Amino acid sequence: MRETVYALKGIIVHTPTFEKMEWHENEYLVCDNGVSAGIFKELPEQYKDIKVYDYTDKFIVPGMCDMHVHAPQYGFRGMGMLLENDSEWETWFEKYSFPEESKYCDNDYADKAYSRFVKDMVETTTTTRACIFATIHREATEILMKKLGDAGMSAYVGKLNMDRNSHYGYEETTEETISETRKWLDETKTGYGHVKPIITPRYTPTCTDESMEALGKMAVEYNVPVMSHLSEGLDEIEWVKSMKKDIECYGDAYDMYGMLGSTVPSLMAHVVFPDAKEWELLKNRNVLVAHCPYSNAGGGNVCRVMDMVEDGIKVGLGTDVAGQQDLSLLKSMTMAIYVSKIRWGLTERNDDPFAKRRCLNLSNAFYLATMGGGQFFGKVGCFEKDYEFDAVVLDYDGLEDYRERPYQDKFQRIVYNHTPRTVKAKFVKGTQIYDRDRSSLR
């Protein structure tokens, strides 16, 4: 029988606020029935006799939230990354994405591919929660949901909706996309463990008005959130406006169907080029933006993350696999820092060698990966009292350092130089789902 009350001992690192990273050297983090009871130098009297997992000198961090990832694209990660301009992204879809995603009509193929995706996410990443795009195939989407649930992960998974502008036969009729989505919601509304459905129109150009209207109504009827893509590229924005003459901004194309936070929670990936109206919609509707620094940089674009955070827009991080070459949110953090500095240098510095930097640092990026995305799931993303207990143990020993260093320096090296072996253990909602030294916990 699993323990419901226990403690982890180690170097505890978290960011309850955007500005500051807190360090607790070899202290105790107590889990009490799936939530954090707090961090203590010594165990309080009521917890004196609980089990302690001793991770002395190892790092204990909150589980991270991948707010935008395409599970069926994992099989061709690292391919098609040399495209030279935005117009070639259509080639990327035609050559890589749509042909691969169309294969998931075969449940055996989906089972094999999703087994690898889930195994790698559990065992090699800091991710404990994710918002995941599947494909248009209902049965394959349920295969993915079950595998994630069986592994103990927490996630929202979306069956894609695409009833126009696709390729290779990878498209539903409008009637199919509506009926299959309703059937999928009926079959998954109670979830697979901690894995639940989320309405997922791929983006406006691939969804007719009829399907968008139906999806918006189903989101309310089944009380499930919505996720999609928004304002990723300038050509995409112009395409949307040419299709919908009655909108002022791209965001209106979702908002007119209740899918931009007016009726249910909404998550939008990228948002690199929001105009003033779209910006206010995001802010006032509490829409969460999934910042995907790798894929945006691949298109020569950088999201205005600092502006968003300072103005009160919610922001988390996404890998956007296969837009990023792997599932590592630690890499997403470092890239978010790099591109933030580049944006500041090119748009705000004004050739002033003494200009004050206004760009992301490690604490900020860590917050986005934990608390930033975690708020979409509830009280998730730090170790303050009553937050859900998601924790990942990181082991520095595998980096084979030749000298002793302060633990803060070791942590930086983990962030920038980690390997799959860096992940020692993982806990989700109080349940340990992975231990590197044990073959199976589920």
Question: Where are these predicted regions, by residue range?
Answer:
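Active-site gating loops and adjacent loop-to-helix segments of metal-dependent hydrolytic enzymes
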Residues: G75-A110, R164-T174, G233-T263, A336-C359
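Divalent metal-coordination and catalytic microenvironments
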Residues: I11, L29, G34, D57, ...
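His/Asp/Glu-enriched, well-ordered alpha-helical/loop segment
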Residues: I11, D252, M256-S262, V305-E400
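C-terminal cap of metal-dependent C-N hydrolases
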Residues: T17, E388-R442
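N-terminal metal-binding scaffold of metallo-dependent hydrolase/deaminase domains
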Residues: M1-Y47, K58-F59
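Metal-coordinating catalytic core of metallo-dependent amide/deamination hydrolases
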Residues: E139-V272
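Alpha-helical scaffold segments that flank or form the walls of functional sites
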Residues: V30, G78-M153, T177-G191
